[in-house]
Amino acid sequence: MQELTPMMQQYMEIKQKVKDCILFFRLGDFYEMFFEDAIVASKELEIALTSRDCGNNEKAPMCGVPYHSATSYIAKLIEKGYKVAICEQVEDPKLAKGIVKREITRIITPGTFIDDNISTANNFICCISKDRSEFALTFVDVSTGEMYSCLLEEDLQKLVNEIGKYSPSEILISNIEDELYEFLKKNCTSFVQMIEFVDLQKCHEIIENQINVGKIDEKLILSVGNLLKYLTETQKISFDYIRRFEFYRVQNYLQIDINTKRNLELTESIIQRSRKNSLLGILDQTKTSMGSRLLKKWIERPLIDIIEINKRLDSVEELKSNYSTLVQVEELLSRMYDIERLSSKFAYKNVNAKDLLSLKKSIEVLPTLKQFLSSFDSELLKEIYEGLDTLEDIYALIDSSINEDAPVSLKEGGIIKEGFNEEVDRLRNISKNSKELLVEYEEKERNLTGIKNLRIGYNKVFGYYIEVTKSNYSLVPDRYIRKQTLANAERYITEELKKLEDEILGADQKLIELEYQLFCEIRDRIEAQIERIQKTASNIANLDVLCSFARIAIDNEYVRPNVYLGDRIYIKNGRHPVVEKMIGRGNFIPNDTELDQAENRVLIITGPNMAGKSTYMRQVALIVIMAQMGCFVPADEAHIGVVDKIFSRIGASDDISSGQSTFMVEMSEVANILKNATPKSLIIFDEVGRGTSTYDGLSIAWAVLEYVADKSKIGAKTLFATHYHELTELEERIPGVKNYRVDVKEEGKNIIFLRKIVRGGCDSSYGIHVARLAGIPEEVLKRAEEILKQLEEADINRKNIRKLRREIKKEFTEQIDFFSYKKEEIIDKIEKLDILNITPIQALNILSELKHEIIKAKERQLI
């Protein structure tokens, strides 16, 4: 260490404090990295690796990035899983005695990275604490000042579901929770970090010192306190700007697990992994980033309180009914900047003049916006009107102080508007008019001395001077101080000229320093009002989402749903909001739906693949979600009895990372549904059992369907799509189970999918027809038809089917004791069977019984 240069010694001392980070070490206009950090960063960032003399007879590996463009490089490192420590020069190099003082000013982690240019979405960091039988979760977005907390029972699947709603970039847990750490690493995409938790008392102190959000549930203290401790240690700032703390209970919202969120493509499409072609992508007609972020929260947390739901629906209806006002409000909203994110910029002292001008432009529309809102009668719009602060004092301050063309940099000058500060105006005048000032002084001295050829000059040794020729020496006044003698002239200075020189030469620097000082004062005055700005941003976000709902209702001909506390879901000509947008409204076939606890509890849906079963079931779930969000829905009519949870089991995929097969994944999801569904839930099952053999799959599907249909077990409203046509028998066995099919039209060897859901079961899967549509060669299709015919005639699997029917049969219409029958009587019984009037299943059951009794009779030598 002693052999290193002083600067490199300073680097090593600082690096020891952040061993787990890549250290960005400020040197002039660059952030430099050395040694192992440089090797890693040069590779990850694809920048040149050089070297620097470090004083120990060898060169240190080195790379660097310009400080003004460092954010994009930091983003790349964060994305690759690294943490970055920022080390800044904390004193003016010109004033430094020896090595410039440097300190770590911030540690950037996945959950604390902020860059408006990369994404306008939330970036949450999460902290999880565990107490007895509960998890406490706290989520913070440092860029917006939002904080949310909830309590969950100790259920790992529910933990993953709740984490999935926020998609945090970083999760913090106690360093003693090894099992939880391994689980989260395996089941979450977030950066998971173990930290040393402080105790309850220390957490109370941290919370009291950092935020002012009122009383917090004691069970949340460890989670909130340790998260704030981590943020304070890494960000080196106070988090008193966090004023929006929301504690919520999961059961107070429509619960949607992470699999259902993915299957229904609520916020991103499965294939593209983007918001395009997702429900969010369709519904997002917001005009502000604030509104877009709030809409995503509403989609992931629909309501179950019908009063709150109808407050939203009332507002949407009123906006929709006042189209001209809606258009004007939308135009005003489109002029709003992301003022919600200003709170963190003030806290980090990252606000620049452009940010204040953006705030000013946003505030500028508020009085007009509030005037439009004054005409509305719906409760929620009235609440927004009353809560909308027009911030006119902040507008006046910015308007009077900040230049419209102010630069982004705070160290270039040109920030403060003329007339705001007398000293700024004076210095700016000196800086701009230095030549004129010197000419004025020169003319003044000529008049005072009578020296007509007196001139003002400048050199680097003496600065500004007065030059007088030999012929005028006698006119030189005593106040002139001689500085230099030339062959034919003398050079002088005066106290006044020296003062003018100081002003001229120092005006630019003094002006920059004064403007920066004034800007900081303005910034601090506005920061003191940040809570008002946050409340306004929140009201703007709510208004923006409601306007978005009104806009899509108008553009897509959505209707207001009747949301109530009953158990019936009735949808007339419902449509899938995403699919109809993709293929065009005129090409989408709408369908009716009726679900209730009594007559239509479970709908078994059969029909060929590609016929539209999955689309239909998804659209029912999406319409329910939209209704409980307070959004109009794609239908001619909709009556939605509030549901508490929505589950879906759709698709098949291996979980390679955990070594789980398609079938194991499927069964795990089914188990989760059976464990957590209630009579008020809505369940979607798509092809349960297809991940295993035909008979295992059929038996599982049958048993699952019986279980969810049974009111004493679950009795939830269920849509059950299947290719097991045998399940259609359950309509006759279980009250509330109804058969539906997707209608098709056969034309020779071709079929036409009519996409219409109609009553009754389907007795053919049309597999070969679908294969023909997929482009399978005709030769292969002909061979498939031959094999199918042979299999149907031979019925080679009858034995297994008979066995299955015996196992699951609850009741057989006629019990016959064949033990007393003679061989002739058995033959006679068979001859009398009315083959044309019994179902295949009944025939198989009878054959199974006959065979069984014949074997027993032989054993007893009855035959």
Swiss-Prot record:
Name the InterPro entries on file: DNA_mismatch_repair_MutS (IPR005748), DNA_mismatch_repair_MutS-lik_N (IPR007695), DNA_mismatch_repair_MutS/MSH (IPR017261), DNA_mismatch_repair_MutS_C (IPR000432), DNA_mismatch_repair_MutS_clamp (IPR007861), DNA_mismatch_repair_MutS_core (IPR007696), DNA_mismatch_repair_MutS_N (IPR016151), DNA_mismatch_repair_MutS_sf (IPR036187)
The record's annotation in CDD domains points to: ABC_MutS1
* A Gene Ontology term for the protein's cellular component: cytosol
Listed name of the protein: DNA mismatch repair protein MutS
Q: Which gene encodes it?
A: mutS
Q: Where does ATP bind?
A: 607-614
Report the protein's function: This protein is involved in the repair of mismatches in DNA. It is possible that it carries out the mismatch recognition step. This protein has a weak ATPase activity.
Q: What molecular functions are annotated in GO for this chain?
A: ATP binding; ATP-dependent DNA damage sensor activity; damaged DNA binding; mismatched DNA binding
Family recorded in the similarity comment: Belongs to the DNA mismatch repair MutS family.
What keywords does the record list, in alphabetical order? ATP-binding, DNA damage, DNA repair, DNA-binding, Nucleotide-binding
The GO annotation for biological process reads: mismatch repair
NCBIfam families reported for this sequence:
mutS1, PRK05399.1
Q: Does the keyword Phosphoprotein apply?
A: no
